[in-house]
Amino acid sequence: GFFGRLASLCPRLEFLTARNGSVTARDGGVPLHSLYDPEREAGQGVAGKNPSRPSAVFFGFGLGYHAAAWSRLHPSGRLVLVEPDPARFFAALSVVDWTSVFSLKNLVIAVSCPVSSVLALIENSAVPGEAAFSGAWFLDLPRFTGHSDGYFSELRILAARNGEKDRINR
């Protein structure tokens, strides 16, 4: 069935049906999203984040519920999605409706990119007059990044350094 095809695409994840009927997943027993209502959890997780400057960078994004919720709240915002594992990205595309995400005019999806390239993509996608790093809200949840700890650890360090440069240069 459908879950079997998803499991063959991304064998590390266990796909299951949430109580509300949506698809959710676990990675090594850790739920990526709510086992009851992933959409509601995602909506609450992004509500009120950086409303004056709708710019966000997601380090990992699970199945995409948070990205979809954020893009519905900020349809003219800038969103950078970072995922080092292409299989996770394609599994997410198969599960969640990404229409609101792909409707964004300022969207960057960095899949399987070296960390240095991700930093450049974040910098180059900044809204003119806005600091690329210190002006953005970062979603960085261990359940979305645990599958690639080394990659995201390096990215966190370099992004923090660039955010500090943003603040100094302002």
Give, region by region, the residue ranges found by the protein language model.
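N-terminal donor/sugar-recognition subdomains of glycan-related enzymes
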Residues: 1-170
